[in-house]
Amino acid sequence: MYDLSSKFNSFYTTHVVLPQSEQDNLHTKKNLNIQRLKDGLKEYNAENNTSYSIVETCVQGSVAMSTVVQNEDEDYDIDVAVVFDKSVLGDKGAQATRNLVANALKRKTKQFNTEPEVKTSCVRIKYADGYHIDFAVYRRHYDSTNECWIYEHAGSEWSERELRGLTDWFKLQNDDSDGDLRKIIRLSKMFCKSRTTWKNMPSGLLQTVLCNEKLQSTYERTDEQFYYTMQEIVNRLETSTSVAAPVDDGRDLTQRNIDHQRMTNWKNRLESKLEDLEVLFREDCTKDDAIQAWYGFFNHDYWGDQIIASESYSVNSVTKSVCRFFDGEQFIEELYPMQLLYHCDVSVSYTHLRAHET
């Protein structure tokens, strides 16, 4: 495979990894809206003579795993779990508890363009600049026998689920791969977001599980590891588009038809674009060929700029060569081989003058 690792690594560092300043911004928004929720609950309690409160919060998803990637549309997803005590909620159902969270948020987000949206698995608030925060709602009770907290997620109904299980699992897998897993997941997400026309692509969680399942850790170069991991994912999805969670007793992450359609879309689009990378394995592959191939795969301006820079370098090289050719005084013998032959006619006349004596 053509070694373009220097530029590939530069692409990853400068255009894939989310800058620390942006990561800090996400955490600031997270903290601000948790406080809004708490303040909204206090107001709700004062009006309704209740005592609901958030007893625990936990960042989940890509923010917790540090797999968020740069996004030109700034459509960043922040997942936050908010936990109530089961004893305080009483017999309040999953839907009713999500409605409670939405009510509390609505009181403190009146400046937003859209009201909090109650979804099946969370309550979402959207920022005008593209950010959105998903509040996953939980309740907990203490298991004195096993001396641990039991958490239940408010989905279509209450269901037992680990609060930090996925994040802990990911950190362990990433450490075992010396950080390579996080790199491959980020690159996979960049591919899935590479075309605005690509709808219904898999969630970050589904990509995370399959990237871990098929990670080709025998390759040292990131570009090779990414390529062969994606190839293995295509092969895997040819067999099955079902994915099970690595925690929560292997719950099905692809229960809906749309989930399977997203996995199929991923497979088809990956397969098509991987074919365009076959030029990287040709013996006559040039640097320009490799740049063009990765540009076609990621559809990112970074690679387009590399093509322009390469073409500009070629033109400048020719110009400099021409300039050097005419730089300074030029002699004909520097251009053509020469053999000089001389023919001379010499005529000598001699006159002897005798001096006169005096």
Task: Give, region by region, the residue ranges found by the protein language model.
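A structural signal for beta-rich interaction modules in eukaryotic proteins
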Residues: 346-349
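Conserved catalytic core of two-metal-ion nucleotidyltransferases
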Residues: 98-144
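Conserved nucleotidyltransferase catalytic core and NTase-mimicking acidic/glycine-rich helix/loop elements
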Residues: 180-293
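A generic structural motif
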Residues: 84-90, 216-218
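Long, low-complexity C-terminal extensions of enzymes
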Residues: 272-322
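Extended, alpha-helix-rich binding/interface surfaces that flank or overlap catalytic cores
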Residues: 69, 131-184
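Conserved small/polar residues in nucleotide/adenosyl-binding loops
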Residues: 351-358
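N-terminal regions immediately upstream of nucleotidyltransferase
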Residues: 1-75, 87-96
